[in-house]
């Protein structure tokens, strides 16, 4: 039976970079820009249609409408708008305009007071502008990203709770939106595990996303490519299917946010469906001997990432190993069998932070082909 291929979408970050590049080209060429080709953070070339294209003296305003693909969220249809002015100075100054949130709490990887434009989109926006400036008499630019209606969109997110006030966040690590929360994606996870078993793969690596999959491949270079499965928010589905398909060993690889939810017993980890229980994280901290003042700081953290930063700053990375152990045990309970389940936590740059290994005697990480 054939299955419909999932249609990917594009992140707010990718659309912002495209809009900024279009505005830069408009300033340099002085001619309407109907479409713009950009390079996503994952190095893919994409052609975006440009909706708004307006020249006002030394300023250009262009916009790109976000298409979220087969997993539309509250930002689907958002008009990512870039207002650009070119400068002689060799730097890109990035500002947040109407509809883009401002960071008011620590722990998000962005300085307090800065617009909620994540590091990778910031880099992508700068790179696309500089690409256009090659060979021109300009060396930099002032860029303002705005999203009409962003404040209303933000009401459907957790932004306010996280201290992101005034609009949505400009996010995305690859530029691509994969439809992790659709029934179709769930079906694709099941299909991938069945295919792995068909090719006699006895160990599968369930990852929570593209970045963690890339890092997992570095951790296990000898495994077949079929072993690596992006389960997204459906780790629980991946585990249950692995049991049905007689997979001998499951390894879960993820980052602090998703694994913290799984340590709390949540097997459907979509960020809109559940939030990280920092009280639970503080209890884990106490269980491994982390002093009470630090445990309280962990409980009061804004995010799991913030909690991790607190542990790192105080030399208590040991919590990551305990989280991995709890995740592995929760996954084993979810499986309902004695199937071997291990867990690895990676940092945002791929560094291995902690692991809990549960290899059976018969399970071997066989060399891939």
UniProtKB/Swiss-Prot annotation:
The keyword Hydrolase does not apply. Pathway: Cofactor biosynthesis; adenosylcobalamin biosynthesis; cob(II)yrinate a,c-diamide from sirohydrochlorin (anaerobic route): step 6/10. Its EC number is 2.1.1.195. GO terms for biological process: anaerobic cobalamin biosynthetic process; methylation. Keywords: Cobalamin biosynthesis, Methyltransferase, S-adenosyl-L-methionine, Transferase. It is an enzyme of class 2 (transferase). Belongs to the CbiD family. NCBIfam families: cbiD, PRK00075.1-1. This is Cobalt-precorrin-5B C(1)-methyltransferase. It comes from Leptospira borgpetersenii serovar Hardjo-bovis (strain JB197).
